[in-house]
From Swiss-Prot:
Function: DNA helicase that possesses intrinsic ATP-dependent nucleosome-remodeling activity and is required for heterochromatin organization.
The protein's name in its UniProt record: ATP-dependent helicase fft1
Family, as annotated: Belongs to the SNF2/RAD54 helicase family.
Keywords: ATP-binding, Chromatin regulator, DNA-binding, Helicase, Hydrolase, Nucleotide-binding, Nucleus
Top EC class for this record: hydrolase
Subcellular locations according to the entry: Nucleus
Matching Pfam families: Helicase_C, SNF2-rel_dom
UniProt GO MF annotations: ATP binding; ATP hydrolysis activity; chromatin binding; DNA binding; helicase activity; nucleosome array spacer activity
Biased composition range(s): Basic and acidic residues: 92-108, 186-203
Domain Helicase ATP-binding: 426-592
Amino acid sequence: MKRKDNKELICIPSSSPPSTPIREENYYLLTSSPIECSPIQQLDLSGSFKNYSTTSSRANGKKFGQLAMQSRIFFDTTDHKKYVESSYAAYDPHDQPPERDVSLKESSNKINPSNFFDSEQITKINAVKKRFPALDSEMIIATLEKFNWRENITIHKLTFQKLLGRGNSTINKSAQKLNNQPIEKSSVDKENAKRKRYVEEGTKQGQKKKPLRVIELSDEETNEDDLLGQSPTACTTDANIDNSIPENSDKIEEVSIESSGPSEVEDEMSEYDVRVLNFLNESTLQEIVEVSGCESKVVEYFISKRPFPSLEKAEALCQRNAHAATGKRKKSDGRNVGRKLVNSTYEVLQGFDAVDSLIAKCERYGAMISNTMRSWHNLFDDKKMEQFLNTSTGSISYEYNSQQPSSIASGITLKSYQIVGLNWLCLMYKAKLSGILADEMGLGKTCQVISFLASLKEKGIQNRHLVVVPSSTLGNWLREFEKFCPSLRVESYSGTQSERINKRYYLMDTDFDVLVTTYQLASGSRDDRSFLRKQRFDISIFDEGHYLKNRMSERYKHLMNIPANFRLLITGTPLQNNLKELISLLAFMLPKVFDNNMQGLDIIYKIKTTSDGDIERAYLSQERISRAKTIMNPFILRRRKENVLSDLPPKIQHVEYCHMEETQLSLYLSVLELKNLVNANRENILMQLRKAALHQLLFRSQYNLETLSLMSKRILREDAYLDANPQYIFEDMEVMSDFELHKLADQYRHLHPFALKGKPWMDSAKVKKLCSLLKKSRPNERILIFSQFTQVLDILEYVLNTLDLEFLRLDGSTPVETRQQLIDDFHTNENYKVFLLSTKSGGFGINLTCANIVILFDCSFNPFDDMQAEDRAHRVGQTRPVHVYRLITKNTIEENIRRLANTKLTLESSLTTDSEKIQKEISGELMKSLQMDGRVDTMDGSVV
């Protein structure tokens, strides 16, 4: 646009700090190249302009950069000669005239940030520049300004753009512009809808209103600044000032708008702007609360005002009505509430897109694996094969081998499905990928892994391999190596600190094929971790791979630092229906694919769950969980017993209901009344109800305070308590159960008079049912008894001693070095009728096929824990039918737990091995049922 005098002007945005002087009589020369000089003498470290002088030196005139455009000065392109003469009049005539830069790129490279930014801002610029060296300085500065110099948010945004394939295109656009090359508009830009941005110019009291000056940019310039959805057509704050220079200097327009009210400026909504706006306009209350993390009251008010025509309208409503929504007074004006809702939603959506982008990288590898497995179709049924087929082209050259390795010990023959597993492992290794061997418990995963390592050695691959296992299975792995392939040279890395020091020196001078160690040592001390890293293993195998589900844990990070060419995870549990855990497993298996890209996923891990629900329940996450599982299929091999084992004996399930007697029932009802207390803790009440259904000795009802006072004084006569404080002892006794106090009295001579009379440990509904089952068992039958609680195992020891039955016990307190010996003793010595085990320690990774009866004394919240325990006996090598007995106390909370656990097993949306999550869900449902009716059925059918 031209003025009446035919002069063309370009006007620069003018929302500068209050200290910035405005000199409208000064004109700058504007050509197709950047401005040559600036009358601004210098810019202090705080970012404010100092008074300029026309007598400044030429050196100060060189202190010019892109940010000089932020000064509130007009440019007259027609009178530029007059301006040049006046601006150089005071310069030293002996100095050479300032050189003109011929390109924007050269000018931007000459910018010295120290002249325009303080030290903190310079540090942030360098941090972003180090992370994204391909971006030029002006792009980095503009992005930092957009996000108020928050470098973490800037890096996240740039990372997402890079992950989604937009970062490179943006950089290319910038490079094209710098070289004066034509720029093509992306398809996303063409599809973006126009939107209006309402901008308010804030003015302080007593401050003069400043004219708004707008630069009209060409399409090419709009594309260049479209990095993160930012539109450069209009901005009114320093953080959003456009720093680009119009290439067509003939089109210059002067616009003067007062800042007393909002102004409408045409802008384009970015891809994410449209998605966020649609999400906020269409999603439910719970979904917005889960994603944004805002309070329900704020979101309710927000929803009541929908739909919103723009994100700015949504932000403004939340900002202006935050107090009305919450009903609370705060020092701030509440503007951050609305900003948090929109920004949090924006970041979460980008986080999910980052997940999609990373998962997409796995599709190519999955296609190669599945296409190779087409030739194995005769080994799978059609339905199973469909899960592996992919329409993508490309495959891996691999010939299926139906023979087992010749180095496998004589007398051992791999089953057909194990041969398939061996070939799958070899295929993944040849493809330089990684995988998860997730066969159901008892199908011989250990045997398949050992055969895989033996096969590699026969092919001439003489490398070292690492096997990381839980402490309870270390001895079993060593025995399995010796049993299946004695030709493999296997070493164990375990023992005390001094023993491990000697072991490290020994291993440095020893040739071995496989090193077996535990999770505790592999992620423990610095010396152990350093030793394992220096070994440069070819293959790293991780038993019970679900231990690596948390990418943020120290264990995960330490194990990830152990270099390996191939990683294999072994697990017998189903994969978690949890986006974070699926991504963690993928990242651990394929670190090269995920390298330098995981930072963008941190937002997913920072999503806070609310009391109203869990982020994994939102549809946003569900569709990606489904896709992640589908893509992971080629990297996972999972078979079930009923599909591959025709000769495995059946597993027969029994549910034995136990009826409480009067004493136990009275105790249970008294605990049930606690739920009516105002300050009652939900989790504590549920635990107390479970204890009451198990055994009354788990409470303190027979030892009163007077008795405890006497016991605390008498115990001082014992040598172990000569110097003890009786008050402290009394306080400890107050929180002990009747059975713990009885054990204490039974242990120390001076407390014998306080021991319980008779055999009260036999007076429990479940104990009586257990005794009945033990008496019915045949002489040649061996029995495994599992319990969640070690104190229950203590009671069962007294029960078995009363029945005069020999038994063994293994729980979390059992030393690692003695666990395998206990298992061997149970296998070889038939005098041991019963093996007592804790569900957590004894339910994973051990082989107890010599037993054919499994008794679950109490059920776990997580049904998969119970299934693991059952399969200690029902696995390869079992020759007899396995009977599983679940003891359920009738008309108690145990029935509810069992019913809800069965529901979890049948619902695909709840296939998870996260015990804490399942316990939280079941606890909530149980408390709701208790609060609704507050009733309990007695043993005779009446209702209390």
